[in-house]
Design a protein with these regions (language model features):
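Asp-based, Mg2+/Mn2+-dependent phosphohydrolase catalytic module
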Residues: 2, 7-45, 52, 56-57, ...
């Protein structure tokens, strides 16, 4: 067995692609000082179940305060979502947080589009999300920092099973 293989025959670098760099309970626990300490100036955010539950379009005040605090601290925020629904662009317009939809995570197209929009290098960029197989893996594939948070709401049997496996 070569040095790059795990005991399961999967290359170790592929196994590590599923591990986030940092874990927080909620997105609002991430602080501007933490991001600056790690050289992050662009924070890409998954939308559904990271920022808001699927079941609502109305953010709670702590999220709005967090967004304002990040923006006041000079952290650029951008939603990067796989969603095809209008709720993401609607939120984006209403609360002045830009977005990239149809991002196709774990592919890197949407992530790279957001980075290009703001002129951010991979080492200056992080993506926060609630799903290992889309958000964390997409971040790792793009060469950026991956931050995992607990899913706000598991509303379907499929999501409950998927999060249990993760």
């Amino acid at each position: 067995m070569g040095t790059s293989e795990s005991t399961y025959g999967i290359p170790e670098e592929n196994m590590l692609s599923f591990l986030p760099d940092f874990i927080f309970q909620t997105i609002t626990q991430i602080r501007p000082a933490f991001l600056r300490e790690h050289g992050i100036r662009l924070l890409l955010m998954d939308f559904d179940n990271t920022m808001l539950p699927y079941t609502t379009d109305r953010p709670e005040q702590p999220l709005l305060d967090w967004i304002a605090g990040m923006q006041d601290a000079g952290i650029t925020l951008c939603i990067v979502s796989n969603s095809h629904k209008q709720r993401v662009p609607h939120f984006s317009q209403q609360y002045h947080v830009p977005c990239v939809t149809h991002a196709a995570k774990p592919g890197t197209r949407g992530i790279r589009e957001a980075m290009a929009r703001y002129g951010a290098a991979p080492q200056q960029t992080a993506l926060v999300g609630d799903q290992i197989y889309t958000d964390v893996l997409g971040a790792k594939r793009a060469g950026i920092t991956a931050i995992a948070v607990r899913s706000i709401h598991n509303h379907t049997v499929w999501l409950k099973l998927r999060h249990l496996l993760e």
